[in-house]
Amino acid sequence: MAEEKQTPRMKTHYFEVVRKTLQEKFNYKNVMQIPRVDKIVINMGIGEATADSKKPSIAAEDLGLITGQKAVVTRARNSIATFKVREGMPLGAKVTLRKDRMFEFLDRLVTIALPRVRDFRGLNPKSFDGRGNFAMGIKEHIVFPEINYDKVDQIWGMDIIVCTTAKTDDEARELLRAFNFPFRS
């Protein structure tokens, strides 16, 4: 017998709580106008990649463990002599999450990873791009429980971009606040 697929907690939270909250606050005429999280892009830029070309693939493995999806090694688009970078040289890794994996990552980010960040005082509410997308950085990838601290040879940071269908930053801020993102007041 096929096993029943479990719906991610944040997805259920979105459909049962977040949509109603946003509908009441912004008075949308149609349910399709209610903003939603479209995708999450996680990027790791490895500065030491110029010295050791194996580091981006190690970062891609770690990113794969964190997200549950295979990461893509990113390469330099053009050569920059100042940074000793050649065209096509591996420089980092990235993952684009959508649908259920996106909601599961969002859940782990908000409930587990962010509280484990050292000296965390909340997310900057001004980190929106003007089109409803939110960008943040984490200095240590070891805050995620999937990474075994003893087996890590180097600690890397990562950029996390949450893309939403919101038209304004205020709508996106309320959407993420409804997902329990810990914004600074």
From Swiss-Prot:
Pfam families: Ribosomal_L5, Ribosomal_L5_C. Part of the 50S ribosomal subunit; part of the 5S rRNA/L5/L18/L25 subcomplex. Contacts the 5S rRNA and the P site tRNA. Forms a bridge to the 30S subunit in the 70S ribosome. GO terms for biological process: translation. HAMAP family: Ribosomal_uL5_B. GO terms for molecular function: rRNA binding; structural constituent of ribosome; tRNA binding. This is one of the proteins that bind and probably mediate the attachment of the 5S RNA into the large ribosomal subunit, where it forms part of the central protuberance. In the 70S ribosome it contacts protein S13 of the 30S subunit (bridge B1b), connecting the 2 subunits; this bridge is implicated in subunit movement. Contacts the P site tRNA; the 5S rRNA and some of its associated proteins might help stabilize positioning of ribosome-bound tRNAs. One of its GO terms (cellular component) is ribonucleoprotein complex. Keywords: Ribonucleoprotein, Ribosomal protein, RNA-binding, rRNA-binding, tRNA-binding. InterPro entries: Ribosomal_uL5 (IPR002132), Ribosomal_uL5_bac-type (IPR020930), Ribosomal_uL5_C (IPR031309), Ribosomal_uL5_CS (IPR020929), Ribosomal_uL5_dom_sf (IPR022803), Ribosomal_uL5_N (IPR031310). Belongs to the universal ribosomal protein uL5 family. This is Large ribosomal subunit protein uL5.
